[in-house]
Design a protein with these regions (language model features):
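Cytosolic, membrane-proximal regulatory domains of ion/volume homeostasis and mechanosensation machinery
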Residues: 1-3, 75
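Short, surface-exposed secondary-structure edge patches
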Residues: 3, 30-34
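Short, basic/aromatic beta-hairpin or loop at an interaction surface
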Residues: 8-21
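C-terminal structural segments of small proteins and small subunits
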Residues: 10-12, 48-83
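Short alpha-helix capping/helix-loop boundary micro-motifs
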Residues: 23-29
Length: 83
């Protein structure tokens, strides 16, 4: 599942960041910010117009991401999210 498809307040684990093009600067920057395999992530909120931007929390840090940026991040929903 892509991070952009994750419902709000559902915990997930990052599986990886996909490069849209070779040497993708945005994907590289997302990895530098901490969107790496094994990190827990969740969408905290979404903007009022077109649900943009997404307020995403990874660890104790929050980032505002466009949906197109969040769509590059592959996640797996944590099993305890539905327990």
């Amino acid at each position: 599942m892509k991070l952009s498809e994750l419902p709000r307040r559902v915990a997930a684990t990052v599986e990886g960041v996909a490069d849209a093009v070779p040497n993708d600067a945005i994907a590289r920057r997302l990895r530098e910010l901490g969107f790496v395999r094994g990190e827990r992530v969740e969408i905290v909120a979404a903007g009022p117009v077109g649900a943009e931007p997404l307020l995403v929390q990874i660890g104790f840090t929050r980032f505002a991401l466009r949906r197109s940026e969040a769509a590059r991040i592959e996640v797996t929903v944590d099993s305890e999210a539905f327990a």
